[in-house]
């Protein structure tokens, strides 16, 4: 009888793991278990009555690098090529990003000319920060905060404005707590290998082999900065779900796992309330802190490690305006914590993907609120209600973008514990977890955003790697 592998979690990581498990030469029986009623995790797209698409989670995927190429290959394999909406390299959403500082939108400098010119909010041309960086010695610590790393190598302004904002945009987190080694491994490795970030990025880490397809070649030729799908990004997990169902994968949704136990013969028993399943191996693609509550007593040391990987909550407010215009054209803007801790940034959805504006076309923007700073709002006595988030989002859109008329449509969603925080020393937690799994020969593989990347590409790759580890061979991709 063949092996049975249970995949916990029907987000994009669990779906990708299941997809690659069944592509091996001798695929196991795969059972995907999801606690909620829907699959796709944080990727969720809602279509308005006018046909406009509102993304409640991720809204674009980067095609760059080996991981970006692998995701595009997946899109082709699922037959979604005709649905792809690219943002080409010459598009304003690819070229223009802004910081909101001192009550003003400032374009981030790009290209050599931009680096040589004074570019507010920075007091000097960023060329000087780059020159300073080239002359700095290599750091000696095995890890440090993003803020400390950026301040040491690039100066206080880049640290407190650019890197602070970037951490808020990517992780909804505090650069003074997040780990440079785990959050931005390419920057950490560049310094370790070449003594300089700039030298490291220029010389590169060597080209890793990349998959090839007509879509990948097109993305490269047209220098895509990101892409989406015509019906919204949720089309991707939906297509994966349909593919899995067609290949005989058992998909159980609305089935929260109550506990995991090891049988005497080494198989897993997965308790689902009033029923249970058995498996030879488990791939866990649920958050680390959730898995820590399910593990049996034999895995208590692992549970303790996983319970320390925390996540923050983000309020996402989608706003739609009739007959309104943006003061600038670009991807969006970020807000450093020194300016407005509550507002992380605003994405200009209609600039990147006007095809999703509906009929008649409208202006769509998305305001991100909270993250690490949500706990401070709560501590200050604020009731974290949809009304509060809508008010804060509309005020931000009015103040920062001049959108003073009330929106014609508004969606408010609080995503609880949606973005894991790789705080300083995160790499040691991962090392300890892997050492425990290896030493105990536990038939458990970890995947998902809790470990080595929170972006969609990272999650898809973590699912693929988990499947490869279980199969003991590369899947057919």
Curated annotation (Swiss-Prot):
Pfam families: Amino_oxidase. This is Protoporphyrinogen oxidase. Keywords: FAD, Flavoprotein, Heme biosynthesis, Membrane, Mitochondrion, Mitochondrion inner membrane, Oxidoreductase, Porphyrin biosynthesis. Disulfide bonds: none annotated. It catalyses: protoporphyrinogen IX + 3 O2 = protoporphyrin IX + 3 H2O2. One of its GO terms (molecular function) is oxygen-dependent protoporphyrinogen oxidase activity. NCBIfam families: proto_IX_ox. It comes from Mus musculus (Mouse). GO terms for cellular component: mitochondrial inner membrane; mitochondrial intermembrane space; mitochondrial membrane; mitochondrion. The keyword Flavoprotein applies. Monomer. Homodimer. Catalyzes the 6-electron oxidation of protoporphyrinogen-IX to form protoporphyrin-IX. InterPro entries: Amino_oxidase, FAD/NAD-bd_sf, Protoporphyrinogen_oxidase, Zeta_carotene_desat/Oxidored. It is found in: Mitochondrion inner membrane. Induction: During erythroid differentiation. Belongs to the protoporphyrinogen/coproporphyrinogen oxidase family. Protoporphyrinogen oxidase subfamily. Its cofactor is FAD. FAD binds at residues 9-14, 42, 57-60, 257, 449, 454-456. It is a peripheral membrane protein. Its EC number is 1.3.3.4. GO terms for biological process: heme A biosynthetic process; heme B biosynthetic process; heme biosynthetic process; heme O biosynthetic process; porphyrin-containing compound biosynthetic process; protoporphyrinogen IX biosynthetic process; response to xenobiotic stimulus. Pathway: Porphyrin-containing compound metabolism; protoporphyrin-IX biosynthesis; protoporphyrin-IX from protoporphyrinogen-IX: step 1/1. Binds 1 FAD per subunit. Inhibited by acifluorfen.
